[in-house]
Amino acid sequence: MAGRPGYSEVIFLYVVSVAVIARATDNMPVNKDVSKLFPLTLIHINDLHARFEETNMKSNVCTQKDQCIAGIARVYQKIKDLLKEYESKNPIYLNAGDNFQGTLWYNLLRWNVTADFIKKLKPAAMTLGNHEFDHTPKGLAPYLAELNKEGIPTIVANLVMNNDPDLKSSKIPKSIKLTVGKRKIGIIGVLYDKTHEIAQTGKVTLSNAVEAVRREAAALKKDNIDIIVVLSHCSYEEDKKIAAEAGDDIDVIVGAHSHSFLYSPDSKQPHDPKDKVEGPYPTLVESKNKRKIPIVQAKSFGKYVGRLTLYFDEEGEVKNWEGYPVFIDHKVQQDPQILKDLVPWRAKVEAIGSTVVGETMIELDRDSCRDQECTLGVLYADGFADQYTNDTFRPFAIIQAGNFRNPIKVGKITNGDIIEAAPFGSTADLIRLKGADIWDVAEHSFALDDEGRTNCLQVSGLRIVIDISKPVRSRVKKIEVMDYTNPKSDKLKPLDKEAEYYIVVPSYLADGKDGFSAMKRATARRTGPLDSDVFKNYVEKIKKVDNLKLGRVIVCKGSKCT
């Protein structure tokens, strides 16, 4: 950490669900000599999310006003440099998943462009992220096949195929075995075990992550593997749980999913000071048999490349370590060949994405969507409702905040903006749902998920009052609705829990994903057009966005709620 072997100011001791602060030097050798120990260097990235082009510091599109950082050409160059620099310390490059989704590059070019650049970086092992399922197993299968042809293994110990037809020929082992410097190393892949609830996994489900890691690690130990790495796409908090409850045989966890920036308290290494530090790099967690398991993660979007060097004794126990997340700032050179390789892909993206479809006079915000009503969500919901509106019928619209990925700035709105705003490829489905179920959906939107986030509904045709001072599942104070049989009236009346209402929702939501199980109680459902087409058509119809009626979702406390 911060380049000093064995240093860490703080560890998180995770036992059951209690975090205890302790000195990281506990049980560390007084003698810092590592000459008799076996070094293993882990170079790792996670949650790239299609950031092939350079980005600004916020990991959005880099403009002429910005100082550009990251980008696949810089990431490639830095990984190549680190592999060479630590050649004598047995370097292994790992990719912890979620390479799909996040920019127009993926939305237009899908697995093809992703596989092309992953092949060039060629990790020793990869695991899957939840976003690799964004276009169902059918959209994942050719990606896996392409990587497999290049000898790049994708490993997931807790993947349950359930005879999914699209993945039946895909090779996804639980782990791989490597011989590095005459030492036998096992790498176990694991994916967040609720992925089938938040992604379009088809028949595929995920078994308990802790149990899967424990079981596979024990099997590797029986096969005389003495160093075991867990390559996890489960989140920082879940990785702590894995270390505490399944850490008897594992040695280190390389993580992903939560986009966590880990950075040691006294490190002098370059970084973006605006990046919130969630814990030290590495974070140490004590297992049930009192072993300390290091956990690392390298934030997201190619902004950092992690580098951790571990030192093992003859028994395969970690005795020392050093490393830090390497900041991929503007000073990092871009690999010239990768820059050339980007050119033909960029031409395809620009040809489709640059078409202007409208204009906005206000910023269409995405960052606040999870906690409250947001301008992007309101406009999107209005577009959904408009899709099915006629002279005598105007349905409501409900969209979950997690549907949105990128804001739209003031100015021209391009086809690229439309797709990047909500890039998941849902359809705009018309459903019929009972009032009581709508109430349940609203309650769930302000119940925290596993990452401690709300999922505020973005709505059209409704007014919802949320009192966040109340207990979870008792926060909805009031829901009022417009008369969907009279499109010209803006009058609101109380929701009737016994009545049925017509609502337009993303197909993802209609399927009950993100925990919105009440949606599956719909008594009728009509599959609609692609959501991005609906949004595009609505923007083209209104031409200019300059006035949105807000106040549809009121988030308040106690006496301030009306």
Swiss-Prot record:
Consequence of substituting residue 224 to K: In strain: Rockefeller
Keywords from the named record: Allergen, ATP-binding, Glycoprotein, Hemostasis impairing toxin, Hydrolase, Metal-binding, Nucleotide-binding, Platelet aggregation inhibiting toxin, Secreted, Signal, Toxin
Domain of life: Eukaryota
Activity sensitivity to pH: Optimum pH is 9.0.
InterPro entries, sorted: 5'-Nucleotdase_C, 5'-Nucleotdase_C_sf, 5'-Nucleotdase_CS, 5_nucleotidase/apyrase, Calcineurin-like_PHP_ApaH, Metallo-depent_PP-like
Residue pairs linked by disulfide bridges in the UniProt entry: none
Site (Transition state stabilizer): 131, 134
Gene Ontology biological process terms from the UniProt entry: AMP catabolic process
Annotated positions binding a divalent metal cation 1: 47, 49, 98
EC number: 3.6.1.5
GO cellular component, one term: extracellular space
Cofactor(s) the protein requires to work: a divalent metal cation
Predominant place of localization: secreted
Record field: catalytic activity: a ribonucleoside 5'-triphosphate + 2 H2O = a ribonucleoside 5'-phosphate + 2 phosphate + 2 H(+)
UniProt-listed Pfam families: 5_nucleotid_C, Metallophos
Expression triggers: (Microbial infection) Dengue virus infection does not affect expression levels.
List of residues binding AMP: 370, 405, 424, 514
Name of the protein described by the UniProt record: Apyrase
Organism from which the protein derives: Aedes aegypti (Yellowfever mosquito)
Lineage start: Eukaryota, Metazoa, Ecdysozoa, Arthropoda, Hexapoda
